[in-house]
């Protein structure tokens, strides 16, 4: 009796294949196969169109390529790390580094922020009191290979090109008009670039502003420079 047993699978194979059964199978398989082909095509297209997606995400921030010092700017909205181009703009870089090491910037605020332009600080306390650099003004130092790219740090100054002291700004986006021959024939000294924390720059640049102490574009809620420390110097 055991020889007469046929498993369920074998029974299915033993059934006669009719035109109707073939049609039913094909009718079910055709849309299924089409769906598989479409999915394969979609996946292939995604792989072709986005082969460098991860690379693009990781290269949106600048990376230090030399042994230059790194300024760690701790603010009330987060930390910004800036490579200071001591190798390319030494006098301006050393002025900033010396002020940071002397704890000059600790507790000051970003007193002027304009979205899509820049964030500026290093000269005023939260109550509007101006703080003067103990080192006095420095000469304008322009390196033609250092540009006002997104995240560049530069020195603020008055109409006199050699009047920069302690106030600095960080570009929120590319600012070619700050190069020599732009809004000012002499240009503004750029001396480094953000390597981490450009999102913090964006956040600061996006806050609501008002007029305080006779100055416009002052953040409604103070953004404090808690400290600036220098690494690798």
Sequence positions of predicted segments:
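Cyclophilin-like peptidyl-prolyl cis-trans isomerases
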Residues: 2-233
């Amino acid at each position: 009796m055991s020889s007469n047993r046929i498993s369920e699978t074998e029974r299915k194979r033993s059934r006669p294949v009719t035109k109707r059964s073939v049609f039913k199978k094909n009718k079910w398989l055709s849309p299924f196969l089409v769906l598989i082909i479409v999915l394969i095509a979609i996946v292939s297209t995604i792989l072709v169109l986005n082969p460098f997606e991860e690379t693009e995400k990781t290269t949106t921030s600048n990376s230090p390529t030399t042994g230059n010092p790194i300024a760690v700017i701790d603010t009330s909205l987060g930390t910004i790390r800036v490579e200071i181009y001591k190798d390319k703009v030494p006098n301006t870089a050393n002025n900033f580094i010396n002020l940071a090491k002397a704890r000059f910037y600790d507790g000051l605020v970003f007193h002027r922020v304009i979205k899509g332009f820049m964030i500026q600080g290093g000269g005023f306390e939260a109550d509007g009191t101006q703080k003067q650099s103990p080192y006095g003004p420095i000469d304008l130092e322009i390196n033609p290979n250092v540009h006002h790219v997104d995240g560049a740090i530069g020195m603020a100054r008055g109409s006199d090109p050699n009047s920069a002291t302690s106030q600095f700004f960080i570009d929120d986006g590319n600012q070619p008009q700050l190069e020599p021959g732009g809004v000012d024939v002499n240009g503004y000294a750029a001396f480094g670039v953000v390597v981490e924390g450009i999102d913090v720059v964006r956040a600061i640049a996006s806050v609501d502003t008002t007029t305080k102490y006779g100055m416009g574009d002052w953040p409604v809620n103070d953004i404090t420079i808690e400290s600036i420390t220098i690494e690798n110097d």
